[in-house]
Amino acid sequence: MERSRNLFERAQKLIPGGVNSPVRACLSVDSAPVFVERGQGSKLYSVDGREYIDFVESWGPLLLGHAHPAVNKAIHEAVDKGSSFGAPCEDEIRLAEAVVDAVPSIEMVRMVSSGTEATMSALRLARGYTGRNKLIKFEGCYHGHGDAFLASAGSGVATLSIPGTPGVPDTVVADTLLAPYNNLERVKALFENHGADIAAVIVEPTAGNMGLVRPAAGFLQGLRELCDRYGALLIFDEVITGFRLSYGGAQQYFGITPDLTTLGKIIGGGMPVGAYGGRREIMERIAPCGDVYQAGTLAGNPVAMAAGIATLAELKKADYPALEKRVDALASEIEAILKAKGVPVTVNRLASMFTIFFTEEPVTDYDSAKKADGTLYTRFYQQMRDQGIYLAPSGFECAMVSLAHTEDDFAAMLAAVRNVTF
């Protein structure tokens, strides 16, 4: 990894931490980052000439794998016509039609340029629509780096053990109410004390940024009922789960319909994109037809729209249950191998995602996720990477499996797990 290390040293002189998103620095796994030259299918190729089987997928967008021919073709054709217009184009409508057709809760949708923009905009809309200010979020859930969401957040905030962040005034997070994930009783108590002031509950319907944590039976339905009772909006942050758990996302998978949904990652096919949508009466409060302002220079970017259209067209044909069955078998075998080594381990999995927690206890919320042994994960990560298996450089993230992963890829993954020593 000599060239990767040299590039990292060069980057650190110019870019804070040498990276443009904190987890990529690999600090929590005591490693230098791999600098990537290209991706193809299920593989990444580093500047050092190494091939890796990729189980990160750019943190989730690449359910089709790297450089999918249909997506690449759409991108090339779009960029040949121009990279950005700052004016409406037909592909904005075509992608909106695909999203509305797929996602149960969405009657209208607004395109933005990132998942963070989507969640920030959805919260502003919820506050504008309800005339209330308070928000309930869950410990360990990550909704981007908007100020209101950086209280007890997951993802890089959890990876780097940052309790919050300087630069966010106390007055901003004062309206953010926290509850443990899967703890409906705590949510009930918050509504009993603040119900008239709560604009929304935002939740990852399957948590993916404290590692993968499934919703307990009745949890999402309970949130739906509480929001209905108190007149608050239920926001599903489906930036990770949208088009991954099923074509209609987590809300289709679990059969629970939120008021607003945020999307990102997969809907751009690897291009920078986000979206938020919901019931027509709520979405019509957004400017210019309503009084809740939101805008973006690159929102509806034609290249990103083309990539999204091509991606969703391919995913509409995908066999999601078959992929889930394959991933469940893979995760079960990984868990069995590690347990046979005498290692404390719990492997949470759902659809095409899984997380290896080095703890014997069930992981059902942020507190139990934090009990996992980070030192064991570091050893595991380093040895897996040395064997050509590219995992997230954090125990608080998910392994992502794509439709491009083959049985040979799975066999190589399992062989590498067998070779790990602790």
UniProtKB/Swiss-Prot annotation:
Which cofactors does this protein require? Answer: pyridoxal 5'-phosphate
Question: Which InterPro entries does its entry note?
Answer: 4pyrrol_synth_GluAld_NH2Trfase (IPR004639), Aminotrans_3 (IPR005814), Aminotrans_3_PPA_site (IPR049704), PyrdxlP-dep_Trfase (IPR015424), PyrdxlP-dep_Trfase_major (IPR015421), PyrdxlP-dep_Trfase_small (IPR015422)
Residues of the signal sequence? Answer: none
GO cellular-component term (any): cytoplasm
N6-(pyridoxal phosphate)lysine sites (modified residues): 265
User: One MF term from GO for this chain?
Assistant: pyridoxal phosphate binding
Name its GO BP terms in alphabetical order.
Answer: protoporphyrinogen IX biosynthetic process
The entry describes its oligomerization and partners as: Homodimer.
Protein name as it appears in the record: Glutamate-1-semialdehyde 2,1-aminomutase
Recorded source organism is Oleidesulfovibrio alaskensis (strain ATCC BAA-1058 / DSM 17464 / G20) (Desulfovibrio alaskensis)
Its gene is: hemL
